[in-house]
Amino acid sequence: MNTNRRSFLKLGGAALGASTLPFLKMLPAQAAGEDVIVAVMGQTINSLDLHRTGTNRPSYQVAVNVYDRLVSFGTKTAEDGNLSYDYSVIEPEIAESWEETKEALIFKLKPSGKFHDGTPITAADVKWSFDRALALGGFPAVQMKAGSLEDPKQFEVIDDLTFKINLIRPSKLTLPDLAVPIPMVINSKVALANATTEDPWATEYLHKTPAGSGAFMVERWDPGQQLVYTRNENYTSGPVPAVKRVIVREVPSPATRRALLERGDVNLSFNMPNKDAKELAGIDGLNIQTTPIENSIYSLCPNLAFEPFQDKRVRQAIAWSVPYQ
């Protein structure tokens, strides 16, 4: 049985791909007492700060659920009935509207925008956050540069609610690049209050203590064990989520995750092995969901030192058998 955004989680349990985690704010409260969703995954969240050097992919969910961006991608129901991003649609998030010219992007922020602590979101917060992504280097800087966002001098505060990006070159990727997780907007007042001379960008503080405006807040984080989200009751970038609390537990063993799901001890299990997914697909009360994997490159790299991969025809046959579409 396929589900759409509104009927998602009507069944007792679901096995999904990890990319569903960013959709937490869209889940209806129909599991675990209608208030709490319990999920298990095999991966480990190693930081709550996506800009921090070494932050891994499982941690991206924190940036999406706890922080907002100027804009976001739309969503759509895929042909198989599952929820997916719609990369052809750019929607406002912190921004209320924007204007595009050949020289610049000018954003008007929502006057109602608030961080989790009630502090108003300003253009100064956006600039500080963008400056930080570039200054810390590594992947955040690479991602920003993919949209020709390369120099802090490009980012200009016009007034509290007006933020301008001066374009160094025309690029069709600039606006979409603002909707990916990296250009998250941080509460600069909180961050600066916890910065030091040795750590001017508050990486140690934000590593464990997010300062965002997203649909969820981090209630607690026990590294290697669990992450607990709680709903932002005063969310200003969209509707307040239906689900009040989400507990994401780290369970390395696929067999254990499967057992927890089958017993009804959890509502969601992520990264289900193909074998388990096939075996569970026909069980009443369980729903296997798939989602496209975003922002990733998968490669098949045979070891050419061994047969049969030294044979060009074998390599061609493998290439032709891959369903690229």
Placement of each model-derived feature along the sequence:
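C-terminal segment of N-terminal export signals and the immediately downstream linker at the start
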Residues: 23-42
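Gly/Pro-rich hinge or "lid" segments in bacterial periplasmic/extracellular proteins
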Residues: 74-77, 84-85, 89, 181-241, ...
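Ligand-site clamp/hinge motif
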Residues: 204, 233-279, 308, 320
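N-terminal export signals
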Residues: 7-27
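Alpha-helical secondary-structure segments
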Residues: 122-129, 160-166, 214-215, 243-245, ...
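N-terminal lobe/hinge region of extracytoplasmic solute-binding protein
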Residues: 40-101, 131, 211-213
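Surface-exposed binding/hinge segments that line
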Residues: 99, 143-195
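Aromatic- and charge-enriched surface segment that lines or borders ligand/interaction sites
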Residues: 94-139, 158, 164-166, 257-260, ...
